[in-house]
């Protein structure tokens, strides 16, 4: 079957030279695509997890009794929401990256302790996290004050009320908006190619650069793969949203 597919795309290339699906009949190029796919998955999963954590913590800190803490969180939100994620990525990697400590694995080459993949995760997580803070804040405000007052009457601390009462309800209310933000985050990971992160788009552009006849196939495959990835995420989030829905909240 694999040999049949390989021969099929070789024949297509002979008939239509501008449609060279080289990654289907050249194992080396296929390996590059597979590597890019897994880097994209790893980058996306890491950014989703960290951005949600940032959103949860930031939303809680927004309710702090200390004005300084609230101002710091608000400043963070304004900075990351009002500057392009591409500029943020370059700032983290080139501006802050020069201060990163290095180590020498072989006693000769100096390597920064935070790689380009690490900086991409940090930058994109902070970017998406700023939106998640506002999403979770809106969810928290949707929880009736009487619910919080009841938990406090039971002797719960502010942190316990947030963890066990407010956040579970707020999370359910926030899921639709969170879904949209995470979809945008997955699409934004393609910008990591600017700092040479070998994700999916980077690998396809490299193949196109090495084999100009693979231009149309490369862009077509990127388009199809991202439709699939985003489609799976949207479907999963919608299923999760329905499973966690509570009558009377977020409807």
Question: How should each PLM-predicted stretch be described?
Answer:
Residues 1-251:
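Transmembrane alpha-helices and adjacent helix-loop boundaries
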């Amino acid at each position: 079957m694999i040999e049949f597919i390989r021969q099929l795309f070789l024949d297509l290339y002979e008939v239509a030279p501008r449609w060279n699906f080289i990654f289907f009949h050249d194992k080396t190029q296929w390996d590059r695509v597979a590597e890019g796919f897994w880097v994209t998955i790893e980058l996306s999963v890491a950014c989703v997890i960290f951005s949600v954590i940032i959103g949860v913590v930031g939303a809680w800190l927004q309710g702090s009794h200390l004005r300084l803490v609230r101002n710091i969180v608000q400043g963070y939100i304004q900075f990351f929401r009002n500057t392009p994620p591409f500029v943020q990525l370059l700032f983290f990697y080139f501006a802050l990256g020069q201060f990163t400590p290095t180590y020498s694995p072989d006693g000769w080459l100096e390597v920064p302790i935070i790689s380009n993949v690490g900086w991409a995760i940090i930058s994109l997580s902070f970017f998406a996290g700023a939106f998640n803070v506002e999403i979770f804040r809106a969810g928290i405000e949707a929880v009736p004050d009487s619910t919080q007052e009841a938990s406090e009457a039971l002797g719960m601390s502010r942190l316990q009320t947030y963890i066990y009462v407010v956040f579970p309800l707020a999370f359910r209310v926030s899921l639709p908006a969170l879904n949209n933000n995470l979809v945008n985050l997955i699409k934004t990971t393609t910008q990591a190619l600017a700092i040479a992160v070998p994700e999916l788009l980077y690998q396809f552009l490299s193949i196109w650069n090495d084999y100009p006849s693979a231009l149309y196939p490369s862009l077509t495959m990127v388009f199809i793969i991202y439709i699939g990835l985003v489609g799976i995420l949207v479907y999963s989030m919608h299923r999760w949203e329905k499973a966690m829905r509570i009558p009377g909240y977020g409807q």
